[in-house]
């Protein structure tokens, strides 16, 4: 089982939803006067939009397909991923958001993460900008690819069309509104998509539980056929648990999430956004975990077959609801895919347009030209990600985990040290980025045969050690300590 029975209501809901997203892109097309408008929405995003946009762009199709699939296969042991992510997101909002917002707006007008690194360490040679830009492009191409795979699997299962055709349709929709609308379009669509995703992850598990005859009945069935799925620890090692919890480390280095902190309307909006964002996340993660866990019981009770565990949400949406509701629920997967891929495309395009073209190759480029370059970059990055996504057997979770580790190791430690340690230097930042990224790449290829731990763990540790060692053996550049003190004063002023 895996193909949805094609019907007019399902097709209608998909078309309506896609047209709504494209309309938002067209609406904001003429509102983008500057690169700050296009990339940060003129720093005018309120707490609700900032919170839900951060959540929706963070989770992607992984939330509705990858995570439920992992719980379906491995049970509660895989819920450690959700726990790690929740803790990481909370720490990110509480400790990183305010400081990064101050640094990128009050102290310096930084539009991109690479911008921030350059101004934070007074890097007049643009080395940090170039390294971070390369890291962003390399890992985001894989990350965007995971979203395109999710979208393709959705269209393939929904419409029964060939994978490559499904991939083309999903890519075209995502690229279109990102190309036109920029950051405001992405954030407003994220608001809609975030609410739709959470609603779907509340409704589907509840209806599943009702059809099973209650949670107790579902657990009873699982205990009979697959009891190991009910254990948080059984059948797993300490290394596996550490690997799952370590997903939380990735939050500190995700450019498409960090940029939400940079664009929020006011520093005083951060606490409210934190409550909204974490509440959305916890509810959505619980829903995804419950659906994946109880999916085993449902499939067994009603004598069904499921070829691809990552399609459990698609199958449940088809079986439990009428076609109109199914169309809405399946649009939630499209929403998840679109929200993340569009954010990542936008960050990638800003990297090419701002960090390469406008800073290195044409410093006097007019704003309109930079925006043209950024829109062309959206197309270019999407084409490369599309090519990688043509492997229909690729696991959504495995692609996401690789890119997540890459950003967490190369940027996460640098972001944390740069915001909390005034003694950190430009050389330390360079060493941290290079060692973190290279450790993830090399460990993924060669290290797992020695110790099968999630590559973000060694990557984050190596990067942190490199930052401390190289910073202690190099000097702090003029002005950086003063800027750090200014940031601390701004933080202190918020308490009064």
Model segments located where?
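Membrane-embedded helix-loop-helix hairpins and adjacent transmembrane boundary segments
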Residues: 1-496
């Amino acid at each position: 089982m895996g193909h949805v029975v094609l019907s007019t209501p399902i097709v209608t809901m998909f078309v309506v939803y896609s047209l709504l997203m494209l309309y938002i892109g067209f609406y904001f097309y003429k509102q983008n006067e500057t690169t700050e408008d296009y990339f940060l929405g003129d720093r005018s995003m309120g707490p609700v939009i900032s919170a839900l946009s951060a959540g929706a762009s963070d989770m992607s199709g992984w939330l509705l397909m990858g995570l439920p699939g992992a719980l379906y296969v491995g049970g509660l042991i895989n819920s450690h991923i959700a726990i790690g992510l929740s803790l990481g997101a909370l720490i990110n909002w509480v400790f990183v958001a305010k400081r990064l917002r101050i640094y990128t707006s009050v102290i310096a007008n930084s539009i991109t993460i690479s911008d921030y690194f350059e101004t934070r360490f007074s890097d007049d040679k643009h080395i940090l900008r170039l390294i971070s830009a390369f890291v962003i492009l390399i890992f985001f191409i894989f990350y965007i690819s995971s979203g395109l795979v999710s979208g393709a699997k959705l269209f393939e299962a929904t419409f029964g069309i060939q994978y490559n055709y499904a991939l083309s349709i999903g890519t075209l929709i995502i690229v279109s509104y990102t190309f036109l609308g920029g950051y405001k379009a992405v954030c407003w669509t994220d608001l809609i998509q975030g609410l739709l995703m959470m609603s779907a992850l509340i409704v589907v598990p509840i209806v599943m539980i009702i059809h099973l005859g209650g949670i107790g009945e579902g657990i009873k069935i699982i205990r009979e056929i697959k009891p190991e799925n009910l254990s948080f620890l059984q059948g797993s090692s300490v290394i596996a648990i550490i690997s799952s919890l370590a997903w939380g480390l990735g939050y500190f280095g995700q450019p498409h999430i960090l940029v939400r902190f940079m664009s929020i309307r006011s520093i005083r909006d951060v606490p409210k956004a934190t409550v909204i964002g974490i509440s959305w996340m916890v509810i959505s993660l619980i829903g995804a975990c419950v659906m994946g866990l109880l999916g085993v019981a449902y499939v067994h009770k009603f004598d069904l077959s499921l070829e691809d565990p990552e399609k459990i949400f698609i199958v449940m949406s088809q079986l439990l609801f009428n076609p109109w509701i199914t169309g809405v629920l399946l649009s939630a997967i499209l929403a998840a895919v679109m929200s993340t891929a569009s954010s990542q495309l936008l960050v990638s395009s800003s990297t090419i347009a701002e960090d390469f073209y406008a800073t290195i190759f044409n410093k006097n480029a007019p704003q309109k030209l930079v925006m043209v370059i950024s829109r062309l970059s959206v197309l270019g990055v999407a084409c490369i990600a599309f090519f990688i996504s043509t492997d229909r057997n690729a696991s959504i979770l495995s692609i996401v985990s690789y890119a997540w580790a890459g950003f967490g190791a190369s940027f996460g430690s640098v972001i944390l040290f740069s915001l909390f340690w005034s003694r950190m230097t430009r050389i330390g930042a360079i060493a941290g980025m290079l060692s973190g990224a290279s450790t993830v790449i090399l460990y993924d290829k060669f290290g797992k045969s020695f110790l099968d731990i999630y590559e973000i763990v060694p990557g984050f540790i190596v990067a942190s050690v490199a930052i401390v060692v190289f910073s202690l053996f190099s000097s702090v550049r003029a002005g950086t300590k003063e800027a750090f003190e200014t940031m601390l004063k701004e933080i202190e002023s918020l308490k009064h």
